[in-house]
From Swiss-Prot:
GO terms for molecular function: rRNA (cytosine-N4-)-methyltransferase activity. This is Ribosomal RNA small subunit methyltransferase H. S-adenosyl-L-methionine binds at G33, G34, Y35, D51, F82, D96, Q103. Specifically methylates the N4 position of cytidine in position 1402 (C1402) of 16S rRNA.
């Protein structure tokens, strides 16, 4: 059964994005439209939303019907959105990284081990599928992906078992892959399902999620107005590290070459961000109790200066 979509850290997103009437905002990860709708309801602002998943278009059309010219939707991944935005600039930009609840809850999408379905995991429906990767990749490559993107200690054991099983029969469903992982790692009381990290790792790899994030951040300066705010919600330590380092590298205070040097002689003259979250914001205990998917979320925000 598909669960109702609950936007993660919605109040915190609105707090740090601080929308104002007449301003324009970019929702880079539309999903079920939770952030876009909240922004449009908050004040008389304008929202452009992006998503590479064609399955969200119907939801986008519903919001377009209700908010008319205040809302636009562009079917694209955010890493390659710049040409399609046609030189638009925004007063605020928000990214809610990772997989959406809609994708997790539809078995045919193949994102979740909780529902048996085709082993797909492609957000756009194009390119290499998880099934193709699982059944053709070298054992070492499987282990590397599961370890790098899932931080899975038992990655080699899992990769070895995958190769062993696929020799007898193709691994073509989420249930089969989950069973393989479960056979390698026992369940521990109070811990997450043993298959969680492996599924996460394969999904991140298949959709080039970290590459998309890095590509977007490298170009975001060009579409953010002065004093515009950038808010990023991440769900994985690798995502959060990329965002944290990007904010730090572009917002460090000017450093003089020596204590006698003039202030305009700096090691970092190109800083353009001011961090407005001293450390990553995390969901409240109440939110986690209402939406377990929020448990690993971290929010960081910065302003263009």
């Amino acid at each position: 059964m598909q669960q109702p979509h609950i936007p993660v850290m919605l109040n915190e997103m609105l707090k740090f994005l601080a929308p104002k009437a007449g301003e324009s905002y970019l929702d880079c990860t539309f999903g079920a439209g939770g952030y876009s709708k909240a922004l449009l309801e908050n004040c008389d602002c304008y929202v452009t939303a992006l998503d590479r998943d064609p399955n969200v278009i119907k939801k986008a059309e519903e919001i377009k019907h209700n908010y008319k010219d205040r809302f636009d939707f562009v079917e694209t991944n955010f890493g390659n959105c710049f040409a399609k935005l046609e030189s638009k600039k925004f007063d605020g930009i928000v990214l809610d990284l990772g997989v959406s609840s809609m994708q997790l809850d539809i078995p045919d999408r193949g994102f979740s081990f909780l529902h048996d379905g085709p082993l797909d995991m492609r957000m756009s429906g194009q390119g290499l599928s998880a099934e193709e990767f699982i059944n053709t990749a070298e054992e070492k490559d499987l282990a590397d992906v599961i370890y790098k993107y899932g931080d899975e200690t038992f990655s080699r054991r899992i990769a070895k078992k995958i190769v062993e099983v696929r020799k007898a029969a193709r691994i073509d469903s989420t249930g089969k892959l989950a069973d393989i992982v479960h056979s390698c790692i026992g369940f521990r009381k109070g811990k997450i399902d043993p298959a969680t990290k492996t599924f996460q790792a394969i999904r991140i790899y298949i959709n080039n999620e970290l590459g998309e994030l890095e590509q977007f951040l490298a170009n975001v300066k060009n579409i953010l107005k002065k004093d515009g705010r950038l808010v990023v919600v991440s769900f994985h330590s690798l995502e959060d590290r990329i965002v944290k380092n990007f904010f730090k590298e572009n917002s460090e205070k000017p450093v003089a070459r020596s204590k006698y040097a003039k202030e305009d002689i700096m090691l970092n003259p190109d800083k353009w961000l001011k961090i407005i979250t001293n450390k990553a914001e995390i969901p409240s205990d109440k939110e986690i109790s209402l939406n377990v998917r929020a448990r690993s979320a971290k929010l960081r925000a910065a302003k263009k200066i």
